[in-house]
Curated annotation (Swiss-Prot):
Substrate binds at residues 9, 41, 74, 88. Belongs to the bacterial CoaD family. The gene is coaD. Its cofactor is Mg(2+). GO terms for molecular function: ATP binding; pantetheine-phosphate adenylyltransferase activity. Signal peptide: none annotated. The record marks 17 as: Transition state stabilizer. One of its GO terms (biological process) is coenzyme A biosynthetic process. It is found in: Cytoplasm. This is Phosphopantetheine adenylyltransferase.
């Protein structure tokens, strides 16, 4: 059985993430979406909320897809899941530099697990969770970048935390 891992913070999960999940699920028998905390980021949603959000969003995608949280080195997590492939999405050259370096480090940690890069769909390339949150904080429309359920959750969380800025 070919198992792949698609790791990310998914804060929030975007249409770009969904595209990579759909396509990644076709490449493996089981795709494990690893929801993690990035210690360099300040999340809008906590781990449990992000895991639940991702589970809801991927429920209709065809294939054996599991969503789990992890808080360890990616390669340790991938090995525990029995993965032979790490799936990563690339939007632009800047992503490639970072991802190339990470793939090299991961290969040093475990050379039995390959990293596979999927290019983002052209229409989804500019989408980034960080930008979605920023746009929402300033009152911009985010419905083009996330599903309706995620849009509602992001707007509600920003209001709940009093993060709204600027005038519209």
């Amino acid at each position: 059985m070919r198992v792949g891992v698609y790791p990310g913070t998914f804060d929030p999960i975007t249409l770009g993430h969904m595209d990579i999940i759909r396509r990644g699920a076709k490449l493996v028998d089981r795709l494990v979406i690893g929801v993690t905390t990035n210690i360099t980021k300040s999340p809008l949603f906590d781990d449990d909320e992000r895991i639940a959000m991702v589970k809801r969003e991927v429920a209709a995608i065809e294939g054996d897809i599991q969503v789990v949280g992890f808080n360890s080195l990616l390669m340790d997590f991938a090995q525990r899941e029995g993965a032979t492939v790490i799936v990563r999405g690339l939007r632009a050259v800047a992503d490639f530099e970072y991802e190339y370096q990470m793939a090299g480090m991961n290969q040093q940690l475990n050379d039995r697990i390959e990293t596979v890069f999927l290019m983002a769909d052209v229409g989804l390339q500019p989408i980034a969770s960080r930008l979605v949150k920023e746009i929402a904080i300033f009152g911009g429309e985010i419905h083009k970048f996330v599903t309706p359920a995620v849009c509602k959750a992001v707007i509600a969380r920003i209001a709940e935390r009093g993060l709204r800025q600027g005038e519209r």
